[in-house]
From Swiss-Prot:
Function: General factor that plays a major role in the activation of eukaryotic genes transcribed by RNA polymerase II.
Gene Ontology cellular component terms for the protein in this record: nucleus; transcription preinitiation complex
One GO BP annotation of this record: DNA-templated transcription initiation
Presence of keyword Metal-binding: yes
Keywords: Metal-binding, Nucleus, Repeat, Transcription, Transcription regulation, Zinc, Zinc-finger
Annotated InterPro entries: Cyclin-like_dom, Cyclin-like_sf, TFIIB, TFIIB_CS, TFIIB_cyclin, Znf_TFIIB
GO molecular function: acetyltransferase activity; RNA polymerase II general transcription initiation factor activity; TBP-class protein binding; zinc ion binding
Tree of life domain: Eukaryota
Assembly with partners or alone: Belongs to the TFIID complex which is composed of TATA binding protein (Tbp) and a number of TBP-associated factors (Tafs). Associates with TFIID-IIA (DA complex) to form TFIID-IIA-IIB (DAB-complex) which is then recognized by polymerase II.
Protein name: Transcription initiation factor IIB
Length: 315
């Protein structure tokens, strides 16, 4: 009985028409008496499903009851003040256009972050990187931005370096030249910013190896698996035998692809490989020259030669 009394006490009703049903206006958040129109409750929460608004809908009513998703990386929780349209003459400028409609106030820090996040997303789209890498790059940029350790470096340079680091950390490394191709920053500046970012965040990245690039390079060159496996084996053996000391993994991978392709029927030129790997022809030749005298030891035993080793190009 006591329970029933408590329920009765908590019941919302019109004081003039307690028995009249109430109309719930979820858009306004009000409960209205159906008899006299009195608002007897406000701030009603709609527990129904959310609606989306599409740009081609002609109705002026927006069924959405919430704004865009919050971004936890922004300092203000992604909340900002929006000034709606006014009704008085002071709300319009000399040309009759609304002065303040949809004007948004946002901190300079958040504006800087949003601009950098857009740049990271744009670069990632152009080289087909997944959202997981974009999210990691955004987090790295946020840490650098909050730490204020890279003063004097442009946001574009920091964004490019963070995207490069994110690729390395996610196990899908890209070369500096690939990042530079979709960035507004020079390769040299990205390299500098990369080192400064690692130092500022007190983090590290795994060393890149020839295997990190082999699959992608061979796929872009339209080479079959047989050539890819041979090139991977050649590059790995060359490193293990210390044939190419001081050479970058990218140049070793490119030279190994050149050697494997020249021994098969799927031959690729130094220029074709260089364009894909982002290295100069002379760089490929220098690594190939070191590897050629040991070619017999570098190829896998089951490789089917179309061109014998003694007929391979000599530099």
């Amino acid at each position: 009985m006591a329970s029933t009394s408590r329920l009765d006490n908590n019941k919302v009703c019109c004081y003039a028409h307690p028995e009249s049903p109430l109309i719930e206006d979820y858009r306004a958040g009000d409960m209205i008496c159906s008899e006299c129109g009195l608002v007897v409750g406000d701030r009603v929460i709609d527990v129904g499903s959310e609606w989306r608004t599409f740009s081609n809908e002609k109705s002026g009513v927006d069924p959405s009851r919430v704004g865009g998703p919050e971004n936890p990386l922004l300092s203000g929780g992604d909340l900002s003040t929006i000034i709606g349209p006014g009704t008085g003459s002071a709300s319009f400028d000399a040309f009759g256009a609304p002065k303040y409609q949809n004007r948004r106030t946002m901190s300079s820090s958040d504006r800087s972050l949003i601009s950098a996040f857009k740049e990271i997303s744009s670069m990632a789209d152009r080289i087909n990187l997944p959202k997981t890498i974009v999210d990691r790059a955004n987090n790295l940029f946020k840490q650098v931005h909050d730490g204020k350790n890279l003063k004097g470096r442009s946001n574009d340079a920091k964004a490019s370096a963070c995207l490069y680091i994110a690729c390395r950390q996610e196990g899908v490394p890209r070369t500096f030249k690939e990042i530079c191709a979709v960035s507004k920053i020079s390769k040299k500046e990205i390299g500098r910013c990369f080192k400064l970012t690692l130092k500022a965040l007190e983090t590290s990245v795994d060393l890149i190896t020839t295997a990190d690039f082999m699959c992608r390079f061979c796929a872009n060159l339209d080479l079959p698996n047989m050539v890819q496996r041979a090139a991977t084996h050649i590059a790995k053996k060359a490193v293990e035998m210390d044939i190419v000391p001081g050479r970058s993994p990218i140049s070793v991978a490119a030279a190994a692809i050149y050697m494997a392709s020249q021994a098969s029927e799927h031959k690729r030129s130094q220029k074709e490989i260089g364009d894909i790997a982002g290295v100069a022809d002379v760089t490929i030749r220098q690594s190939y020259k070191l590897m050629y005298p040991h070619a017999a030891k570098l190829f896998p035993e089951d490789f089917k030669f179309t061109t014998p080793i003694d007929q391979l190009p000599q530099m």
